[in-house]
From Swiss-Prot:
This is Cardiolipin synthase 1. GO terms for molecular function: cardiolipin synthase activity. Its main location: membrane. It is found in: Cell membrane. The gene is cls1. One of its GO terms (biological process) is cardiolipin biosynthetic process. It is a multi-pass membrane protein.
Length: 493
């Protein structure tokens, strides 16, 4: 009997192609019919393009980046923690539907339709007894965070996309360990991909002192994570149920301006008051979704009575993630833009939204609203960077003023309208933040905060370069090619 190596190799190759074709057909069926309610049309077409242009590679990419998330599995350990807040949400919805807004705050009354929409989410209840401070520099922020950790009396909860155990990370971990020695409860929830250089073993001493640590969507396989595409991008700190932080700064030396991108410009909020309850609720839900030990239940110590009148800044906390069809933060941003009468100020390091969001911005600009968009001048993710610029032509021709921040890297995620309302948090203005990642933003109805952040934005403009229609039209052909390629796959970036 004679064997032909070339024939056998050809047969094997044919079999592999056939298997790949069958797998792609099955995946195409799943994407089109079984996951149609979880995907936009552009995302569906982008995945089909990848599957059929790169059959076997497309299958591997789908395993890591394409699968959807089960809400049932995420929420299975929530117990009774939502019961009291469901009642509060229902009460506020009924009151708003009757025109009873429960406050004399002018911005809440004026933008009651935005408030009502955000009440559709479990974190979205409106609170008014709040004092808000803002930070745009990482050194200032973490100096204050370390002071607040030192003054903690009962517990500290941290939830971070990136918790780097470098200089800053070690300082914070040491401060937390000191509080454990004093008998406080300390929990850390970090993202397994965002904190890719962190291992659970790095927290052995912390855990030996009584601290608890969980990794979000942790992989059991080294270097492989089948939830690569659905990351917990939230950055939250809660101290004693009285004080909370939320915003764009991660934990690491890079966010102090010590990384390769230079000065790090971001926006973060420090909140004292009733809105901390919403941040605490979000932390508990996220912890319960990942923990393998006894779960959080509702306990009054986690939602204590606040220390007297603190301020009059109405706040709603909005969360979004891939397990929900209701894209709370995207819709909140869009509603703000569509409600603007005078001005819109937007900052986002990654700007790759869908057409409906782009159209909302264009409609506002064409209606005479003064619309500003600030993006980075340098890439930390090249493909995302070029996709960001691919939307510039339509926006510029509609009258949107676009700036590229030149004084380092802008990582701020902010939407501000009419010097009246501002949203600050973790959600970039892109498909990933709107639909794939777990995000959290604060919507603050406070003219003083809005004006302060607008002044900070105007200072940023002095350190930026304005993009014009002429300069954009004259960009090199190689840049145009990169933008076109990036835009083609932007729904899955």
């Amino acid at each position: 009997m004679q064997f032909s190596f070339s024939n056998d190799l050809g047969t094997l190759f044919t079999i592999i192609l056939a298997i790949g074709f069958i797998i792609n057909l099955v995946l195409a069926f799943i994407i089109i019919f079984l996951e149609r309610n979880r995907r936009t049309a552009s995302s569906t077409w982008a995945w089909l393009f990848v599957l059929f242009v790169l059959p076997l590679i497309g299958f591997i990419l789908y395993l890591f980046f394409g699968r959807t998330v089960s809400a049932r599995k995420l929420n299975k350990n929530n117990g009774n923690v939502l019961t009291d807040f469901d009642g509060l949400l229902k009460q506020q919805i009924e009151s708003f539907d009757k025109g009873n807004y429960g406050t004399d705050n002018k911005q809440v009354q004026k933008h009651h339709d935005l408030v009502r929409m955000l009440l559709m989410d479990q974190d979205g209840f409106l609170t008014e007894n709040n004092k808000v401070d803002h930070f745009i520099d990482g050194n200032d922020l973490y100096d204050q965070v370390l002071k607040d950790i030192k003054n903690a009396k009962e517990y500290i909860h941290l939830e971070y996309y990136t918790f780097a155990l470098d200089g800053l990370g070690k300082r914070i971990l040491h401060a937390l360990e000191e509080k454990l020695k004093q008998g406080l409860e300390v929990k850390i929830l970090y993202d397994d991909v965002g904190s890719k250089n962190v291992k659970m073993a790095n927290f052995d001493h912390f855990k030996s002192l009584g601290g608890e640590v969980e990794a979000f969507f942790a992989s059991k396989l080294p270097l492989l994570n089948f939830r690569m595409n659905n990351r917990n991008h939230r950055k939250i700190i809660i101290i004693d149920g009285q004080l909370g932080y939320v915003g764009g700064f991660n934990i690491g030396d890079e966010y102090l301006g010590l990384g390769k991108l230079g000065y790090w410009r971001d926006t973060h909020l420090r909140i004292q008051g009733d809105a901390v309850d919403a941040l605490q609720l979000r932390f508990i839900l996220d912890w319960n979704s990942q923990a393998h030990r006894p779960q959080f239940e509702y306990d009054v110590k986690y939602f204590p009575k606040k220390n007297g009148p603190l301020g009059n800044s109405p706040i709603q906390i909005a969360a979004s993630g891939p397990a929900s069809d209701w894209h709370q933060i995207e819709y909140g941003y869009t509603k703000m833009i569509m409600s603007a009468k005078k001005s819109v100020y937007l900052q986002s390091p990654y700007f790759i939204p869908d057409n409906s969001y782009i159209n909302a911005i264009k409609i506002a600009a064409k209606s005479g609203v003064d619309v500003h968009l600030m993006i980075p001048c340098k890439p930390d993710h090249p493909l995302v960077y070029w996709a960001t610029f691919s939307n510039a032509s339509d926006l510029l021709s509609s009258g949107v003023k676009i700036y590229t921040y030149e004084n380092g890297f802008i990582h701020s995620k902010m939407c501000l309208i009419d010097d009246e309302i501002v949203s600050v948090g973790t959600a970039n203005m892109d498909f990933r933040s709107f639909e794939l990642n777990f995000e959290v933003n604060a919507f603050v109805y406070d003219e003083n905060l809005a004006k302060d952040l607008r002044v900070a934005y105007e200072h940023d403009i002095t350190k930026s370069k304005q993009l014009t229609e002429e300069s954009y039209a004259n960009r090199p052909l190689s840049v145009k090619f990169k933008e076109s390629l990036a835009k083609l796959v932007s729904p899955i970036l």
